[in-house]
Amino acid sequence: MADFKIVISDPQAPKEETVVKVKVVGDPEIKFDENVKEGFELPILKMNSKTAEKIKAVHGVATIRMYKPGTKDKVKITGKIIVDDNIPENEVRVNAEQLVNATGTNELEGELFRARAWQIRINDDRTKLLIGLKIGDEFDGSIVGLKNVKLKIRGGSDNSGFPMRPDVMGGVKKRVLLSGPPGFHPREKGERRRKMIRGNTITEDIVQINTVIKYV
């Protein structure tokens, strides 16, 4: 069975984020099982409805940006918003184990904003719906838990990191003379080089599929 990491980009998430200052608190009751740890499900971010509304996360996915206490090390947790109006405004709760592992503490200040990108792993029968699709094709977002949206395939790569190219037909793996990305970034104008790449079609050998949410 294929094992795909689906990377989802949201083109309508503003690059200049609407940032909400929040207190991030670890909660041992929040789910953090193997499905979350292995990337099959997003971590849970619990907050009240007013906090959620401030960032306008229309797909219910948000990112918390934090700094490890006493350092300049940045830590991000991207997860699924669960509304709980028993939680105070401008407070976000995440699994305590996850927070301590990431930051070394169970409570700290953070910045909350609408996620620009996230990823979900699938390795069950849903993978069969993607095999054979090509760069530029679209599939239903429900495959990765997104309702009422289509995801457009922008590219991908295999387990050796060789990228898919839209101009190479089929599910092939071969060396191609390239003058630009993906697969080759020339250092000089006009430079060309033969590089190993993947074709434009998803096969079981692909491990990452890059997608973008399509808005009508």
UniProtKB/Swiss-Prot annotation:
The keyword Ribonucleoprotein applies. It comes from the Archaea. The keyword Ribonucleoprotein applies. GO terms for molecular function: structural constituent of ribosome. Transmembrane segments: none annotated. Pfam families: Ribosomal_S6e. HAMAP family: Ribosomal_eS6. This is Small ribosomal subunit protein eS6. The gene is rps6e.
